[in-house]
């Protein structure tokens, strides 16, 4: 597909007539079977931010003041978020857990009836709730495992979560020591008091 260039903008934001004529000529070569109106539409489709006269086109209907109808002021265009190929380290553990969880769900669905294993498809009776109509049916309870603690977890995943949560530094933080009293009066005050 042939490409066309944008009309050159002069210092004031408009297009210079010579550059616009050259652009229309190039556009007419690229799209020789289109009418002038169609060529302008193609140019607008290729470059939706600039109208055929060089002014900014928003695509929204405008009022007589030039601002789009329904908005008090025009906002500058926002930059699309960039795609990061290297996610932050604290997200890696969560992504790994999601991957393992989806793999585990696939395995559990494929082998529901192994002897000696409690499997995720147990029918738990939660009892009748208020109103009776909202009680959980056995088929709805069978869709998800009821006990989270019965899922096997990889040691590598656990260690990555420990690092992610900062629990590996528990020895460095005295306020996290278990059994430590908040106030140690014998060390804070002299024995003569």
Curated annotation (Swiss-Prot):
It comes from the Eukaryota. It holds the Pfam family CITED. InterPro entries: CITED. Gene3D superfamilies: 6.10.140.2200. Belongs to the CITED family. GO terms for biological process: apoptotic process; brain development; branching involved in ureteric bud morphogenesis; labyrinthine layer development; melanin biosynthetic process; melanocyte differentiation; mesenchymal to epithelial transition; metanephros development. This is Cbp/p300-interacting transactivator 1. GO terms for molecular function: chromatin binding; co-SMAD binding; LBD domain binding; protein homodimerization activity; transcription coactivator activity. Induction: Up-regulated by GPR39 in neuronal cells. It comes from Homo sapiens (Human). Changing residue 63 to A: Strongly reduces phosphorylation but does not interfere with its NES-dependent nuclear export. The keyword Protein biosynthesis does not apply. A motif (Nuclear export signal) lies at residues 158-167. Residues 1-26, 50-88, 106-147 are annotated as: Disordered.
């Amino acid at each position: 597909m042939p490409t066309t260039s944008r009309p050159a903008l002069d210092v004031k934001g408009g297009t210079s007539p010579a550059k616009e004529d050259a652009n229309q000529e190039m556009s007419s070569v690229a799209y020789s079977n289109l009418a002038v109106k169609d060529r302008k539409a193609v140019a607008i489709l290729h470059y939706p931010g600039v109208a055929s006269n060089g002014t900014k086109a928003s695509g929204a209907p405008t009022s007589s003041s030039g601002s789009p109808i329904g908005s008090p002021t025009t906002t500058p265009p926002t930059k699309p978020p960039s795609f990061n190929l290297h996610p932050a380290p604290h997200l890696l553990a969560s992504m790994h857990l999601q991957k393992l969880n989806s793999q585990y769900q696939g395995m559990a669905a494929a082998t529901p009836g192994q002897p000696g294993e409690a499997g995720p498809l147990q029918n738990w009776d939660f009892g009748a709730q208020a109103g009776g109509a909202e009680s959980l049916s056995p088929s709805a309870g069978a869709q998800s495992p009821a006990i989270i603690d019965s899922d096997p977890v990889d040691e590598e995943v656990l260690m990555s979560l420990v690092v992610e949560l900062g629990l590996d530094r528990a020895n460095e933080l005295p306020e996290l020591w278990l059994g430590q009293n908040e106030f140690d009066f014998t060390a804070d005050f002299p024995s003569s008091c």
